[in-house]
UniProtKB/Swiss-Prot annotation:
Family membership: Belongs to the RbfA family.
SUPFAM superfamilies (UniProt xref): Ribosome-binding factor A, RbfA (SSF89919)
GO cellular component, one term: cytosol
Complexes and interactors: Monomer. Binds 30S ribosomal subunits, but not 50S ribosomal subunits or 70S ribosomes.
Pfam families assigned to the protein according to its UniProt record, in alphabetical order: RBFA (PF02033)
InterPro entries for the chain: KH_dom-like_a/b, RbfA, RbfA_dom_sf
Source species of the chain: Jannaschia sp. (strain CCS1)
Protein name as it appears in the record: Ribosome-binding factor A
BP-aspect Gene Ontology terms: maturation of SSU-rRNA
HAMAP family reported in the protein's UniProt record: RbfA (MF_00003)
Recorded name of the encoding gene: rbfA
Job of this protein: One of several proteins that assist in the late maturation steps of the functional core of the 30S ribosomal subunit. Associates with free 30S ribosomal subunits (but not with 30S subunits that are part of 70S ribosomes or polysomes). Required for efficient processing of 16S rRNA. May interact with the 5'-terminal helix region of 16S rRNA.
């Protein structure tokens, strides 16, 4: 039987979710303690928002955002430059048979939330939302 899929692709296994969360917490701690031997990276405050692992746990995509939202490119470059040391530090704390390859990308969640908030604040959208609320619940029975 085929595994059910949602609109965002195949659902993540419990192991993928657990390993992703372990990597996220450990990376957050490593970055907060400034354990990396790179003054440029240690000078940045970087939030690790989420870690998504591939189904075979060989690749971990790390979604990050520098505090304040500025210096995104510099943060990604610093993380990529120190990827080997970050993997080594992760390996010391995590007891995994294979440590995934780390890929760093900027977390777009906050930008998407801002765009949605701006869209909902527009007068034409607000008018449509208020009209839908005045019409009452839409239950599909035509009444």
């Amino acid at each position: 039987m085929a595994r059910s899929k949602n609109q965002n692709g195949p659902s993540k296994s419990q192991r993928q979710l657990r390993v992703g969360e372990l990597i996220r917490r450990t990376l957050s701690t490593v970055l907060a303690r400034a354990d990396v031997h790179d003054p440029a990276l240690n000078a940045m405050s970087i939030t690790v928002a989420e870690v998504r692992t591939s189904s075979d746990l060989k690749i971990a995509t790390v979604y990050v955002m520098p505090l304040g939202g500025s210096g995104k490119d510099e943060a990604i470059e610093a993380l990529k430059r120190n990827k080997g040391e970050l993997r080594r530090l992760l390996g010391k704390d995590l007891k995994l048979k294979y440590l995934p390859d780390l890929r760093f990308v900027i977390d777009q969640t906050f930008d998407q939330m801002d765009a949605t908030r701006e869209m909902l604040a527009r007068a034409d959208v607000r008018r449509d939302v208020e009209k839908a609320e005045d019409d009452g619940p839409m239950d599909g029975d035509g009444a």
